[in-house]
């Protein structure tokens, strides 16, 4: 730990440090998943099954968004999402079918400190618990650390949303604490769990994710040999 001229411990020097760039993703492609910049024209038809009236009601409990009634409302919602200048939205596409199965966003971007959050994660039931969903998260994290060269990658969720927190920890995010009464939404109070991954974590996290995603870790029917937590 560095020590200054007064004998005080201080953080590591960041000599030559510069601020970060904003995301500029057209697409990212893996074995199973393809991330594409969200497009109403390209993705709305598929995303009606993700955001529409037939989705499970419990899917929306911890999301700021609610399900939509029809295509007209979905188009309005997607256009509102795309109009935001502080967030970058992406569709998660199954490479095997070309179908969009979910969306997520890079948001709360602090360029000066190279901090960014993955949020607004909206996965269809079809996407949850799949290689496609895990690989999509891997591709986005790899972009954050290896292309944008950001230092800190965040995940936040309602403290009562245990599936979200478990998903984050499975991917390699580390729980840091709970911000009490941080948000009011849907007419109720919310404590918010904060989790993060930093650049020093990424090499080990990357190795685990790549080992789990490798074809040899799966049977022909798609079942895994080893869970991600076993790596």
Enumerate the predicted regions with their spans:
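Conserved active-site tyrosine of GNAT-family acetyltransferases
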Residues: 167-168, 195
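Conserved catalytic-core motifs of GNAT/GCN5-like acyltransferases
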Residues: 174-188
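Flexible ATP-lid and adjacent glycine-rich G1/G2 motifs of the Bergerat
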Residues: 140
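Glycine-rich acyl-CoA binding loop
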Residues: 133
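Conserved beta-strand-loop-alpha-helix junction that forms the acyl-donor binding cleft
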Residues: 155-164
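Conserved GNAT acetyl-CoA-binding A-motif
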Residues: 146-156
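GNAT-family acyltransferases
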Residues: 1-130, 143, 147, 188-192, ...
């Amino acid at each position: 730990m560095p020590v200054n001229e007064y004998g005080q411990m201080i953080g590591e020097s960041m000599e030559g440090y510069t601020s970060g760039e904003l995301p500029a993703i057209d697409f990212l492609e893996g074995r199973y998943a393809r991330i594409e910049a969200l497009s109403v024209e390209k993705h709305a038809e598929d995303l009606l099954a993700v955001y529409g009236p037939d989705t499970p009601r419990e899917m929306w409990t911890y999301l700021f968004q609610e399900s939509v009634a029809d295509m007209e409302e979905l188009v309005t919602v997607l256009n509102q999402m795309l109009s935001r200048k502080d967030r970058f939205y992406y569709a998660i596409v199954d490479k095997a079918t070309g179908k969009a199965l979910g969306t997520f966003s890079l948001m709360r971007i602090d360029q000066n400190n190279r901090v960014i959050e993955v949020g607004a994660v909206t996965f269809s039931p079809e996407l949850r618990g799949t290689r496609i969903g895990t690989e999509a998260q891997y591709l986005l994290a790899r972009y954050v650390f290896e292309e944008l060269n950001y230092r800190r990658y965040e995940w936040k969720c309602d403290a009562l949303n245990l599936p979200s927190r478990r998903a984050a920890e499975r991917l390699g995010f580390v729980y840091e604490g709970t911000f009490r009464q941080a948000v009011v939404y849907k007419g109720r109070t919310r404590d918010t769990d904060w989790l993060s991954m930093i650049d020093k974590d990424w090499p080990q996290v990357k190795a685990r994710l790549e080992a789990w995603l490798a074809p040899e870790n799966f049977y022909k029917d798609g079942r895994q040999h080893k869970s991600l937590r076993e790596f």
